[in-house]
Amino acid sequence: MKNKRFKEKIEKYLKRQFGVTIDSASKRQVYEALMSTIREDLSEKKFAYEQELKKTRQKRAYYMSMEFLVGRTLRNNLFNLDLEKDVREYFADNGISLDEIYDIEPDPGLGNGGLGRLASCYLDALTSSDYPVTGFSILYEYGIFKQVINNGWQQEFPDYWLDLGKYGLVYRNDEEVEVRFYGRVEEKLTEDGFKVEHKDYTSIQAEPYDLLISGYKTGTVNTLRLWEAKAKTGFNMKLFEHGEYSKSSEAEAIASSISKLLYPADSTNEGKELRIKQQYFFISASIQQLLKNHYNEFGTLENLFEHVALHINDTHPAMGVPELMRLLLDEYGYSWDKAWDITTKTFAYTNHTIMAEALEKWSVELFKPLLPRIYSIIEEINKRFCQWVIDQGKDYTLAETAIIYDNQIRMANLSIVGSHNVNGVSKLHSDILVDSTFRAFHELYPTKFGNVTNGITHRRWLGQANPELAEYLEDLIGDDFVKDLSKIDKLNKYAKDKKVVEKLQEIKKVKKEQLAKYIQETTGITVNPDSIFDVQVKRLHEYKRQLLNALHIVYLYREIKYNGLRPVPRTFIFAAKASSGYQMAKNIIKFIHSISQLIESDELVRDYIKVVFLPDYKVTLAEKIIPAADISEQISQAGKEASGTGNMKLMLNGALTLGTLDGANVEIHEAVGDDNIFIFGLETPEVDELNRHGYKPWEYYNSSARIKDTLDFIRTMTVGGMNFSFIVDYLLTQDSYMCLADFESYVAAQELVAKTYQDKEKWGQMSLINTANAGIFSADRSVEEYAKDIWNIKKVK
């Protein structure tokens, strides 16, 4: 091994901790030694990096997100530190498979879907680009949940990831802080002015753990700060002795619940209350700590916005606005006007959805007793904002823009009012925000809104997930694209080169064979690697329309079985988690499994189509599926998907997009042109028009033989004793996301996919063009826009 120092560290750790040598150590011992050695190396780099930042005193960004879906860290760190090849060879010389060591590491249970993965991509990209940034979130003990499929139904179990995942974390006991809930607020006038005192509160200790973020071949090391909740005082013997049994352990109960699970079900008041506690807990801890550090360095907070950029990633961290106000007012003695000026110059907000149910609202009745001081500040912000709107002569907007309205606290409105910048995450999404969702706000703040299209960290999604493709591209066009993905456009000149196109398809076949093996081992289903791998992998939600995909599969089943269709063989691959309280999403998972079962039991049909549902979708599983995909299903109803990033990862790996003109699909379409993408369905204005005139799904049933035959078949379809008439009833009476309106167009697009796939040369060229034009979807480009246009931060030299 070239890096002798790194090798010696691993061997010393094994000897010191376990009394073993590298050739006699267990895989678990080798894993622990490797994780700990990397953590130590990153800590040393971090120290040097922080010393440089202390000299420059430059502005830093703080990215606040309820989730960070980081994926496994071990391979990512070895790749970024340029150690992977060395360690692989060193381990091989000692009879150890590095890939087997990788497989020991669990995915950290810190995120769920696209929001968390985007946050992690941005931390990676910012670090690789030498920008100073810290992420803030919660150290969830059990993650979101481990998904197990039992008889086609999703079941949720705790995800015990910390036992093996803890080796990458650094505990910072010097930076613990107190977070307060409940109690009452007393206001009084003193010699020093107006004072507010929070009394009879429940105190929770926030304990910090740092996950160090490496950059690609750089000395920059940033931090993801994760807070764990602990009871500050523990069991209260005095209260217990006085018969107040539940109150005696109240703090312990609150603390243990806060950092247990990501996104507890919010169908009850208890669940809603827990979500509020989680959000305030990590926001309060984070802002308290960074203000303390800033004040210790500068002796004032008046220059906070010159050195600190706070970012609200979706509405979950929106309480940062009143919390910063609380600290400035109550702890540091600033006037309201001065505190508000500092706050609004410090915060920026990214909106990630136009879905009404995802624009968080909390009832005053629930919120006020839980966070009395924060509520009083929100109330004052709302009062002053409403008066300002009236003074502008725009009082007609208040029904839409007021922060507190109809006894609800609207967190998106709080984020907009309290931030100096608001951005959407794709061109279409940002247009919808200013033209529709936040139209009234745009009228009030015409210069506040902008767009930053999402991006992905290609070093993980190509370099690590698909090393075969990455290595070939490096040989073909050079390795510039690893640092700067825009350079991948050099591949375009090979679009007509048969040898290159064939080689790319050979690599795709290798990845499909690898995935086929995994599918066989995981589900017992044998799939044909020469079939079209048609992939839809994302959170299960009605607007993402996994149901439309399933309807098409049932349509194909009928055509093959009864009408003599003999299509190009196709493997439909799904992976998705449904929120634990989302019954319709769970029903769709069951429906997909039942279709798979129906097909597997039919000797004729199973030769042509297969349906695979891979359980427990997470980053590591995505890294297996995405490089093997031929078709990328991005079929949300137009106007509903803010951006998406799975579409970008699949495009980069040569999958062809089958999608609506929604989210970032619009920009993928612009990048590759009409001939290298399969577009179908209604566009956003047509969806809006149909909604205005009243969408009637029955009309599509009556006018389309394909729809009628498919739905009639589903009504009679019974698999494992279960009938799916309720799916048909839902589609004919609600069809909230217009599956039937887009069905005929979708089937036609799928027929074009099948026809095109038979022309291997053309398909290969289309695949190449998608990879070659993925450069604009690099997270490096996205974070550059945030750094320059929103946060005003500079690279560390």
Where are the model-predicted features located?
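A conserved ligand/cofactor-binding region detector
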Residues: 1-797
